[in-house]
Design a protein with these regions (language model features):
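Extracellular beta-propeller repeat domains
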Residues: 1-188
């Protein structure tokens, strides 16, 4: 869970199943550790997609999350939950890998890599899939969802570069660091 600036814990519950049938969808919830009260804030659906990412609160006090299969193309999206208005909004929809529509081969199915807000105010994402070879990308955008840009597209033909970013990004000083699932003896 995420401890937000308002003192509440926020999280996403998993879908519930019984005998192979879905009983309930994932839910965004809050928990007040003082009163012990749980509140369901949003029921995710087919248009929002499956949220498996960790939640992140940015300096604008909004909570950010990624979906694995939401948005128009069902390739993933970035969403925010506004603590002031209690509204969920999709701020970016991924086109995914090898999409026939013109545009970048951006992130795809960013299931559980967390977002990070860097010291420059931008939101960064490392996705296991997407990019030119569908081996992952790192990308950034403004907190309002504008100016999406791919920073790096991981490709297996490049020497000394891993593929399939996993675990998110970490900022130390001016640089962002991350890990990949595949690499060589230099990048492992």
């Amino acid at each position: 869970p995420l401890l937000a600036s308002n003192g509440l814990l926020y999280g996403v519950s998993e879908s519930s199943y019984e005998n192979g049938s879905v009983l309930g969808s994932e839910k965004l919830f809050s928990y007040n550790p003082v009163t012990g009260v749980f509140n369901t804030l949003y029921d995710f659906n087919l248009s929002t997609g499956t949220v498996q990412s960790k939640l992140m609160q940015a300096t604008n006090r909004k909570i950010y999350m990624t979906s694995a299969d939401g948005g128009f193309y069902k390739r993933g999206s970035i969403m925010t939950y506004d603590l002031t208005t209690n509204a969920l909004a999709t701020i970016y929809v991924s086109r995914g890998y090898n999409n026939p529509d013109p545009g970048p081969n951006d992130f795809e199915r960013a299931a559980n890599n967390p977002l990070i807000q860097a010291s420059n105010g931008k939101i960064y994402l490392a996705s296991k899939f997407g990019g030119n070879g569908n081996l992952g990308v790192t990308s950034m955008l403004n907190p309002d969802g504008s100016s999406y840009q791919i920073n790096d597209s991981f490709e297996s033909l490049l020497v000394n570069q891993g593929t399939v970013p996993a675990g998110g990004l970490l900022q130390i000083g001016e640089f962002l660091y991350g890990t990949t699932l595949n690499g060589d003896d230099v990048n492992f």
